[in-house]
Amino acid sequence: QAAVGRPAGKYTFARGREAGGEVFNIVLYFQAKDEVRTFVIEYLVLDAVRLHTDVAELYWQFIGRNRSVDTEFMSVSLQLPPGAQAEEVRLWGHGPLRGEVRKISGEKLWWETPFLPRDRYLEGRVVFPPRLTPQAKVLTGRAALGSILAEEQRWADQRAAEQKQALYVLAASVVCTLLGW
């Protein structure tokens, strides 16, 4: 049995606001002891695309931080509307350093991480031709690709610096171990 009022195999869903944005919280109720559990959560997102004059943009946090448990493996599959060539679509992932981002086609995109600590998030950003979402309701009236590319480059540079620093710490640890310090 799960906790009182929280039957195993059920879930709750709530909408809220956090840090200036809308948040969707799903709480899954389950029991597990020395076992692996897999959860598949599928949902359709409406009105999440921002339509700029030069690109359409989807920027979405797939799973937030501050969960009660770590996630051993997480993957996200995103299906864009048909009509774009792969070279017209750009995508990025934000979250753990070990994550992977793949463009399978102009329509199918994939994010994956082998381990997501409870205090880390996984989000994705995609830009694609505006013609794919002519019905988008969030219109910015400005060009955005240049600023998006610049922002993503800054984050990539920051990530590279973090990886380099982690490598230096690892190398120093190995040297200290070899020297018996």
Q: Across the structure, where does each feature detected by a protein language model lie?
A:
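Alpha-helical transmembrane helix bundles of large polytopic membrane transport and channel proteins
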Residues: 1-16, 41
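Surface-exposed, acidic/Ser/Thr-rich flexible loop segments
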Residues: 17-104, 117-118, 122, 132-138, ...
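Short alpha-helix capping/helix-loop boundary micro-motifs
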Residues: 108-110
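Short, conserved secondary-structure segments in the cores of folded domains
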Residues: 112-115
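Hydrophobic, helix-length membrane anchors
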Residues: 147-181
